[in-house]
Structure formats: structure tokens, C-alpha cells
């Protein structure tokens, strides 16, 4: 890449974020794999000579590590999907008070339409609740540009800054014209008392934070205004802007918000004063709509446009022009294929597990989430990462009090166990619980693209590292009944489950297999290297 001139690339939003982080002097990146954000960190490995990028065990650790890098004077980024922000909320809320040293960006990749998640929470609310500025790009060029804006704003106000992506922005490709390189950004360590938020200091930090947000709101110039002779004005942001432009072209006035929190209050008032009617077009919750109404401005939003799933030009067109012919058909034929890949040990394991009837199965988030599908029907409940064991504990304790003979089986993968299952297991040990807990160890974070984790022995950039031994870890937690088995072997799987069901106490089974896709990928790469 030439460092002295601008270049043109065709990039996804995720690729643009990674490139911009490199060009703008970012040096530390941490995150946890999760669609649609995964490819950001994977692309940062291209710049391993300049950037330290890593998979963290979970999102909380990723944010805390990025805070540490910022404190040390290094520009940093923490990357996660929307539900990951729930895990990282504790440090996020406090670092807004203490502020940062070198620029700190937190990526939240939201999933309107629930393409690969368990919910479609709107993380714009985190910006308001945690009092952290938030950018929302609409395309890959803006993903690239907003990293630069975010770092400047972060360091100007000593605040972390959110960049909110959505699935379509993350994975859609568009032209990106890059700026010149400006790397080698490093600040000295800031040892001021604000980084020790005891109550007497925190109350002052909160007051300072409110003043910062007010100043940002009054000086916010991160918007695009398109004025026409129309008396209709639309306020929008992110991917919704693209849909608005496709439907209306230049026939209405548009105020596109790039920094969606805090709002550019003066510009919003000025724009609305020129229009006879104001409409708000946004995906999911009425976040912008409520903020505009709080300014005393009459506007129309979710009265016409749904507050669930993602938008598209057809939905917006129908909201404004109700009588439309040729409505797109939603009669998509259902798939009848098995939910797991050919050769995956989940086929054998869940085939066996589904034959056990007097059990309740508490599952988790991963490829095994699809065990509820035919022909297995081997899942009763799943909530979030790490909950498989915790919920199993709660159910089993309750059934025991009710003198039920049902046993509860908790399931999770190896990566999920390292993410947030360890504390759930400790809870079972500490509170003398007796569910059957099964770790499906396929040596991979497979559902998000076969990434490594603390149990694989390799880092994000494929360098060898210390491998966490699950059996030794469980033994150190004083788990008395530990058994490993080969889940590709039907007889071993049956024997392991029967063994666990005979014991009226806590049992942890480890299915020691491998991801067939990852194995095939590794074999192909090895053959290519040897060619």
C-alpha cells in the first residue's frame, strides 16, 4: 500500500474498519468472535507487524484490555457483536466517567433482522445510557472515515467512542478511497486521579462528563443535509439512509445523522423549522424519534414504520405510499436438510441425546443451538452465552425441591465455556448442584468462522501459545466426576451419558472431537504450503 497517496478499494464495512484502524495509528485490538463483527479482527492480522490483535475470552476482557492500552498511550479498539456489549457493560459505563488517554473505539455490530443472533437489541441505547458518543456509518467509505473521526473526538474529549455497525453495513461491499497514512501515534501514560473512580472523584467525573456531552451536542458537525423545495423532511442515519435515498431520491429534504449521540441539537431544530412535515426513518427502536420529540418537535416515525426486523426500500415505500402492487413474496420453501455439517460429531451426539426422554436440555449459543431442529429436537431452552450451565443449575435445584426424577443436562461448546461458562460451573460446585454438564469440545469457535480460542493452543495470528487443558481446569475447581469421551463413537457417547445419569451429583462430560470444517481447512492449507 502506498503511504503518500490515496488509494481505491472495494471493501466490506468490516474490512474498511480494519484498514482505517491501521492507517490511523491504531496499535491494540481485542474482541470476541461474533457475527457480524468477526472479520474486523481477522483483517487486522494483515498488519501484525504494527498492530497487536487478539481474541479475548469474552467481550468484557476485550474492553478492559483496550482500556489498558489506551491508558498506556496506545490507540485501541474493542470489537464485538451487539449482545457482547451486554457482557462488557460494566467497564464501559465506568470508563465513560474516568475517560481515556489515547483514543479508544468500541465497535458494536448490531443485527436487525436477527440473521445470526438470539435477539435484535438496539445498542444505540447504550450510547445514551453509558453517555458515550456514537457514530453510525451507512457504507464502507463512512466506516473508514468514521474511525478517523472517532479517534479525534475520543482524544479531544478524553472519551471512548462507539461506532455502531449493522449486519448489512458490515458485510456489504462498496468503494473506499483511503486517506494518507498517519501512524506512530503514542501518548505518555496519564497518571491522573480520574483513573481511580472512588465515590468522591466519580461524582465530579460525572459532572464533567455531562458538560462534555453538552459541548459535543452543541458543536456536532457530523451530519449531512440535503435540502430541496419539498415541504417534507426526513431525518435518518446508517443503512436506513440508503433505503430512503433509493425510495425518494432527491424529492425530499434529508438530514442524515452521522454522530447519532449526542444529537446535533441546533442543526436538528434548524432543519425541522424549514419543513412542514418531519418523518424519522430508523431501524428498530424509535431512538432518534424520541430524541427529536424531546426537543419539542412534532415528527412521525414508528406510527408508520415497524420497530422490529430490518428495513428495506419496499417497507419504506409502502409506509409512505400504502397502495403498492407486486408485493414481494415471503413464501420461501423451508429447508429440510440436517442442521449440522456432514461429518460433524454433533450429528452422532445429538442423535444419541435425543433418545433420552426423561431429561431437560439447557443449551447455549453456538452451532449446537440448531439441535432443536429435526431430526433431533434435542433442546428445551437457550438464552445467552454461558447460560447453559447456569439455567441447568436453576432448573435442577427447582426440580429437586419438587421431588421430580427428571435430570437436567446443560450444554455448551469449548469457546463458550471459556467465554462465560467457567463462573456458571463454579456456581454449580459452590452451591452443591447436580446437573449433568457437557462441554462439546470441537477445538474451535466454529459458528463464527472456526476461530481459535484459549483451548486450541493458537492465537488470532496463528502463533502457538499455552493451551488451556479442560480436564486440569475442571480438576482445579474440585469437580469430582469428570469423564471424557469420543463423540464420533456412538457407543462411547451412550456409555458417557448412562454413567452420568446413574450419579445423583454433579457430573461434567467432555466430548473431545474436532470441527470437520476446520480440519478440512487446515489440511487444505497445509497441502498448499507443501506444494
Annotate each PLM feature:
Residues 1-140, 168, 227-228, 251, 372-510, 514-524, ...:
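Thiamine diphosphate
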Residues 2-18, 23-24, 137-340, 345-348, ...:
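Flexible, low-complexity linker and terminal segments
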Residues 40-43, 67, 88-92, 114-121, ...:
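Short acidic, glycine/serine/threonine-rich loops at helix termini
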Residues 43-49, 245-255, 472-480:
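Short helix-loop-beta junction
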Residues 49-57, 98-109, 189-194, 430-443, ...:
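A glycine-rich helix N-cap at a beta->alpha junction
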Residues 79-80, 105-109, 162-166, 235-236, ...:
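Short beta-strand segments
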